[in-house]
Every structure is written in structure tokens, then in C-alpha cells.
Swiss-Prot record:
Subcellular location: Cytoplasm
GO CC annotation terms, alphabetical: cytosol
EC class (word): transferase
Protein name as annotated: Phosphoglycerate kinase
Keywords: ATP-binding, Cytoplasm, Glycolysis, Kinase, Nucleotide-binding, Transferase
Family per record: Belongs to the phosphoglycerate kinase family.
Complex and partners: Monomer.
EC code(s) of this entry: 2.7.2.3
A Pfam match: PGK
Gene3D superfamilies (alphabetical): Phosphoglycerate kinase, N-terminal domain
Annotated catalysed reactions: (2R)-3-phosphoglycerate + ATP = (2R)-3-phospho-glyceroyl phosphate + ADP
Binding residues annotated for substrate, in chain numbering: 22-24, 38, 61-64, 119, 152
Native source organism of the sequence: Hydrogenobaculum sp. (strain Y04AAS1)
Length: 395
């Protein structure tokens, strides 16, 4: 883990602390927040800053607006946060400008200010220097607590911490990196990885990097069919990336050379199309009919996955085992989620739809750590250094 300063290392009393959080939460057309997990995840950092008598200035993006758009306002977020911290949150009209400077200048210790959506300004994603300087001028200390954006070189996460010093980690970012280190750098063995999702192409670097770090790997989801095709078996109408068949063969060979036990599903639930009304069958992996496609792992594969989970001391999970958003193809993903949650192993999960699957399985509080980052979590699994962490102050 990078040896970076945290908020524990900084004198915060009376200081204006500019905190980059990730409040990019789903909001419906009526302005209701559908899932506030990311807001709750930032509360330990915010409460620590308040206890330290700091002035807390929060900044985040929300969605992908093209300029100012009221439906992407952070007002509902400020309202929800104030409920959790039992304190008024001052909602700023913008994130830069004279009004902002006045609000910040008049703020007192233990005030909480929420800046308006950073992405109302295109300069945020361009890492514009002038925009970054204006943001940096609002604070005296910079705190990064937005793991989900740490792979992006945007102004608020990459440029501002190079201008505003000291620049340190909040508790959420620290926790993300600590759990990653426990699972991937100094793990209790055996380490078992479960990888799912639709495409090998999106997980190729993850698979290659994890093969160097894990003892066993189980590939589920539609990704499995490219590997089955690489073994010269028919996959019916299942999703296959034909341009990656040779790569899939290489991965199987690499796993053998590294002594990693490499598992594919042994049976599937197949249907004629992706819908809850399609005729379905349970078939062995080498018997998928021509006019059917694999849409979930089958009961024998679920048992195999549970057996692997039972052998693990550490589990890393990324990606669903099937089309779990459909009632008839949910069992593989949800059963694996529940088995991981009930195991004695240290479990970390994240990226893509994994968190949605865990919520649907009703085990969000039983997995040791569910990452708040999608792309950032995948980049860590790929072995990449996250640029927005490297710019923070070393201890």
C-alpha cells in the first residue's frame, strides 16, 4: 500500500478542509436518492473532521451533465447528508466564483459546505489549471476520499492535490487500500478469485495480473464461453469473443505454468434468448444446443463454486456469474454471493455490477469489504498505480 498521509497526520483545527468525496449516487426523476451507500461511506471522514473543529468543504461530481442542469444538482445529496450527520449542510450555488469565496470566508469551525456539481464545469474533466487553482483556493488542507474516481486525471482529484498542500487520504480511501493490500499483497492463502461478466476483453488485464497472485480462479458469466470455445467445444448462440480465442488458450496455458487451478463452469442454464419468458434447459458445458445461449451457471457449477469458497482463506470477487437481473438467471450469482458472505475467508468484492448483485442477495453487510470503486477497483486488480493516489503527500 502507498505510504501516504491520512487525516490523522494533519493539524485540522479551524482549517478549511477541501474534501473530494464520491457522491455520484443514483437519483430518480423526482429527485429521490435510490441508493445512498456512497454518502454513508464518507461519514466517518466527515465526522472526524467535525470533531477536529475543521471547516468541512465537500466537493463531488454527479452523473454526466453537459453544463448546468438542475436534475444533476447535489441538493438532494446535501439534504440526505444533513440527516445522517444531524447538522445543516450549506448548499453552495456553484463550486467556484465570488459567491463561493464569500461563503467559505464567512464559514466557522464545524460548518459543512457542499459545493455544487463539479461537472457543471467542463474544466473539471479537462484538469484545467485555472479551474484547479480556483478550487484549491477554497481550502487550506486537501483530503481525497473518492476512491471511485482515483483512476481519472480530473481537476478535483488529480490537479488540486498538486496545488493545495497538505494533501492526504480520508478514511474511506485508506480502507479501500488496506483491504486491497490484505487480499492481494499480503494475503492469507489459499486465495480464490471469482471473475464474471460478459466480456473477456474488459477483464483481460485483471485475469493476467490475478493469475500471478491467486491460487485458484473460477471464471463465470458469459466470459466463460470464450474459454470453452478455445477448448474447441461448441457454445451455441452464447456470447463469444472470437478475436480472443487464442488469448483464452494462452491464459489457460499460463495458469498451468504458474500452478494456478483454473476452473470453468461445468453446466449452464441455457435459453433461446435473454428474457424471462424464453424456454430454458440445464445442460453440461459441452452439450449446449445450437439454438440456445448460456445465461447462468448451472446447479453443479454452483456446488463447485461453493466447494472452492470452502477451501479459501481469501476471496476476491468481480463480476456476476450470469444475467442476474433476470429472475430465471439470477441463482448462480446470488448463490455465489451468499456462499462468499457466509464463508470464514476474508472477502473483498467490487467493480461493475458486483455490488448490485450483493445487494440483491441481501448480504451487503456480510461481505468483509465491498469496494465503492468500479473502474478504480478494476485498475487496482490489473496491478496499475492509481494516479490520484500517487499525487498525495508521502508520510
Amino acid at each position: 500500500m502507498p505510504n501516504k498521509k491520512t487525516i490523522r497526520d494533519i493539524d485540522l483545527k479551524g482549517k478549511r478542509v477541501l474534501v473530494r468525496v464520491d457522491f455520484n449516487v443514483p437519483i430518480d426523476n423526482q429527485g429521490n436518492i435510490e441508493d445512498d451507500a456512497r454518502i454513508r461511506a464518507a461519514i466517518p471522514t466527515i465526522e472526524y473532521l467535525l470533531d477536529a473543529k475543521a471547516i468541512v468543504i465537500l466537493m463531488s461530481h454527479l452523473g454526466r451533465p453537459k453544463g448546468f442542469d438542475e436534475k444533476y444538482s447535489l441538493k438532494p445529496v446535501a439534504k440526505r447528508l444533513s440527516r445522517y450527520i444531524h447538522k445543516d449542510v450549506v448548499m453552495a450555488p456553484d463550486c467556484i466564483g465570488k459567491d463561493m469565496e464569500n461563503i467559505v470566508k464567512n464559514a466557522k469551525s464545524e460548518d459543512v459546505i457542499m459545493l455544487e456539481n463539479l461537472r457543471f464545469h467542463k474544466e473539471e474533466e479537462e484538469c484545467d489549471e485555472e479551474f484547479s487553482k480556483k478550487l484549491a483556493s477554497l481550502g487550506e488542507v486537501y483530503v481525497s476520499d473518492a476512491f471511485g474516481t482515483c483512476h481519472r486525471k480530473h481537476a478535483s482529484v488529480y490537479c488540486v492535490p498538486q496545488i493545495l498542500k497538505p494533501a492526504c487520504m480520508g478514511f474511506l480511501l485508506e480502507k479501500e487500500l488496506l483491504y486491497f493490500e490484505k487480499a492481494m499483497v499480503n494475503p492469507q492463502r489459499p486465495v480464490v478469485a471469482f471473475l464474471g461478466g460478459a466480456k473477456v476483453s474488459s477483464k483481460l488485464n485483471v485475469i493476467k495480473n490475478l493469475l500471478k497472485r491467486v491460487d485458484k480462479m473460477f471464471i463465470g458469466g458469459a466470459m466463460a464461453f470464450t474459454f470453452i470455445k478455445a477448448m474447441r467445444y461448441d457454445t451455441g448462440k452464447s456470447l463469444v469473443e472470437n478475436d480472443l480465442i487464442d488469448v483464452a488458450k494462452d491464459i489457460i496455458d499460463i495458469s498451468k505454468k504458474l500452478g494456478v487451478k483454473f476452473y470453468l463452469p461445468v453446466d449452464f442454464i441455457v435459453g433461446k434468448e435473454l428474457s424471462d419468458n424464453t424456454p430454458i434447459k440445464t445442460v453440461l458445458w459441452q452439450e449446449i444446443p445450437q439454438d440456445y445461449m448460456g445465461l447462468d451457471i448451472g446447479p453443479v457449477s454452483i456446488s463447485l463454486a461453493k466447494e472452492l469458497i470452502g477451501t479459501a482463506q481469501t476471496i476476491v470477487w468481480n463480476g456476476p456469474m450470469g444475467a442476474f437481473e433476470y429472475e430465471r438467471f439470477k441463482d448462480g450469482t446470488l448463490e455465489v454471493a451468499r456462499a462468499i458472505a457466509h464463508s470464514q475467508a476474508l472477502s473483498i468484492a467490487g467493480g461493475g455490477d458486483t455490488d448490485h448483485a450483493i445487494i440483491r442477495a441481501g448480504v451487503i453487510n456480510a461481505i468483509d469489504f465491498v469496494s465503492t470503486g468500479g473502474g478504480a477497483f478494476l485498475e487496482l486488480l490489473e496491478g496499475k498505480e492509481l494516479p490520484c493516489i500517487s499525487v498525495l503527500d508521502d508520510k
